[in-house]
Amino acid sequence: LAEWAINGLAHTEGANEALLDLIKKEVAPREKLAYAVGVKRLKTAEPILLEWLKNADAPTQKAIYHALSICGSSASLSTLEKAAKAAKYEWIPETDVTACYLRLLKTMVVNDEGHIAANAAKKLLKDTDKAYVRGAALDVIIEAEGKKAVSYILAALKDSNREYRVNALRLSENIADETLYANLAKTLKAKNNKKVKADILNWFGTNHVVSQIDAVITNMDSDDEEIAIAAITAAGKIGGDTALEALIAKLNSNHADAATKALLSFNGKINNNIMKALDADKAIRIAALNLASTRSMDEATDKVFNMLTSPENDVRTAAYKALEGVVGPSDLERLSRLIEKESGKNIPQIQKAMRNAVLPLPKDKQYATVIPYVNKSCNPSLYYPVLAQAGNPESIAEILKGYNGNYKQEAFASLVNIDNIKMIEVLYNIAVNDKTNAQAALNRYTSLVAKSAHTSIRKYQLYRRALEIASDVKVQN
């Protein structure tokens, strides 16, 4: 009953005096009482807890350390410091003393004992090489001293432990100002640890440090790959015209892929610059084609079409690949003329572009848009992939006309890509009557049955029917 009463008082407002009286009388195990002190943040119990620590077992120690970390003061500092040091600042679940010591320091900062806590944290920086402990100590110093802690942040950047360096940069974000940015930029100019430079560049990018964009751009030309890529990535995050021009220029470099990624996630508008890049040197043009396509830049459509006839093979290849991202329904006429003249490797790219061109339209409208070109074509199979995407009954009928006519394999290749439940019966009939395509038809048949809205009984019947004609073990399984 005493433990129930203690727990109740711990969660009852205005019960501090009553709880303290029960603690003094030790009406329950010390471990439970210490837990209640922590919940209640009962500062007046600190002397009692410190006295109990002298002969406490491990579970009670853990409860007391926890309570002191929450409601303790500088009076508890020496005790927890010694205990944490004895534990070699390890995370020991039995007592949790290291975590409690670090939490006590933060509690002291909140309770106007920041100067004492900061001094203890500075001592801790020297006492251990554990990155996670030193990071927590640095956090205390920054919270206690604010911008006066900059020297400790800069010192952390000279440390050999990257985890600690990165953590120091992260912790500095609440006090970061132009003075800190300038000091970090000086480090970028030094010839010391290259990984430190990469860390700073990554941090500049994450925090959008516009004032240091020149320092970032300078490092884009670094001989060290990690530094160069970090600078390129940071420039994309920071944004701005200067960064944009530098990234466009990097499209013609060994780090073109990194520059492309940075531009795709660029912090700002880039379409006008990409349009200019489409008129630049070949390497930049090719990269710009990819960017224009990925960003679905319909303003680039004419330039992409013009580059389809470029005398440079790699530019033509990039232009055909880019088509799919820059076309819309109004471009189907041009695409039709293009595919009707094409007899080689570019047909799949043009077909993909045609599918994307009509994709924004409803299924019936897709069919209505493409069927005039099918009807007047000498090779209607060129349009089957577009009809398959539409997938409405009229499209299925049109493709089946080719399957039963002069375009059997071309039509079948599109039929198995139609996402329409009506294809279940069509594919079954093909599996029964077309030995060449039977297995592929059954594979698609079972896939459509599986994702259909049919009842379990109806699905069983459809599977059973397929098994009766299946000869492929994989289909049977």
Regions of interest found by a model, annotated:
Residues A83, R103, L338, Q409, ...:
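Alpha-helical, heptad-rich or low-complexity scaffold/stalk segments
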Residues L1, E26-A28, A56-D57, K88-E90, ...:
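Short inter-helical turns and helix N-cap capping residues of alpha-solenoid HEAT/ARM repeat scaffolds
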